[in-house]
Amino acid sequence: MKRLLTGLIMLVCFAGSTSYAQGQDNQTDASAVKDTIAKVHAAISSLDISKMEPLWFHNAYVMLVNPKNKSVSIGWDDVKKNWENAFNFWSHIKVTQTAGPYVRVDGNVAWSTGLTNTNAKAKNGTSLNLPTFESDVLRKDSDGEWKLEAHSAWRASQ
């Protein structure tokens, strides 16, 4: 009986430590995803495609919808062109996280939602300040870095 009880206690402790370790891994991954989202916002604010490029997978499956878009950009070439057009349109843009990001990690895939405030000025002088809802899908690459597979942002109702 003592052996059985000792075995059960060891099993529970091992299972608990495994769950704890997995929870810690998810927390570490969630923090890394949040860091990637912050880098995306910094890249947008920099208006510099060279800062955006390393944050994305460069494949035929990535997708992007920005608030001004009327269609979805699919594939890295279209996504890159979308960002270049956006960066050429604005003379200033600042994206500030106001809620979230709320991150869920499942293995090598993560998704994130959040609210941001976008303050921008177009090269033609038009200014805007609006709340934006964002949704992102990320995947961990072979080097353990979280990169975007999809980003969509649209105006939140005011």
Predicted regions and their residues:
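Positively charged n-region of N-terminal signal peptides that target proteins for export
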Residues: 1-4
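A short hydrophobic beta-strand element
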Residues: 107-118
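Structural motif
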Residues: 58, 106, 141-142
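Beta-strand elements of well-folded, non-transmembrane domains
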Residues: 118-122, 138
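Bacterial N-terminal signal peptides
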Residues: 7-16
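A solvent-exposed, acidic/Ser-Thr-rich amphipathic alpha-helical stretch
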Residues: 28-32, 49-102, 115, 129-130
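Short, low-complexity N-terminal intrinsically disordered segments enriched in polar/charged residues
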Residues: 19-55
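Short beta-strand edge/turn micro-motifs at domain boundaries
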Residues: 129-158
